[in-house]
From Swiss-Prot:
Enzyme class, first EC level, given as a word: transferase
Record-linked PROSITE patterns: THYMIDYLATE_KINASE (PS01331)
Taxonomic lineage: Bacteria, Pseudomonadati, Pseudomonadota, Gammaproteobacteria, Alteromonadales
Catalytic activity: dTMP + ATP = dTDP + ADP
Classification via NCBIfam families: DTMP_kinase
The name this protein goes by in its record: Thymidylate kinase
Pfam family, one: Thymidylate_kin
Biological source species: Shewanella sp. (strain MR-4)
EC number, UniProt record: 2.7.4.9
Amino acid sequence: MTQASAKFIVVEGLEGAGKSSAIALIRDFIEKHTGLAPVCTREPGGTPLAERIRDLVKIADPSDPLCDESECLLIYAARAQLVANVIKPALAEGKWVLGDRHNLSSLAYQGGGRGLMPLVEAVSNATLKGFKPDLTLYLDLDPKLGLQRAAKRGELDRIEQQAIDFFERARATYLKLASEDEQIVVIDASQTMAEVHKDILAVLQAMAW
């Protein structure tokens, strides 16, 4: 595989959309077609510092509630670390990168869900400077169904405990942004896992390998 062929692919979706199984599928597909396992990342997280920030964002502290603006800025601090120290170096070495969430999550959750789009766009522009994935697969699912699925996994984290209208706004933002960007592909995550995986593979197989 040549350096020029390396790609950054991201899986996005609301809680319970099936990102983990989709990522496992894509990871195996990339390894089969390139002979190399991709560098897998998650957001927030993916570096020692970013993982500590993840805990601040995901774990509620009733004694010092995280305000929406702080949440947004912390997530971008983690993302800046990940992009600078993991994603860009991997791509420069010709390695494929597979991300569990990226900037689209902030646009949907903090921009749409929290109503902070001007702040999100400003911080995104300042930290990422136009850097974006080559392909984003957005697993679309009704928030009510997604939260039901998430609850079956165990205790919900701070983000997962938000009111349903937060997730409805986030979903609407995801879909709006997907309609404006051909590099974002919407996958119907209400289907069976087999059907979802079939749709994902169809997208991957259409790429130049």
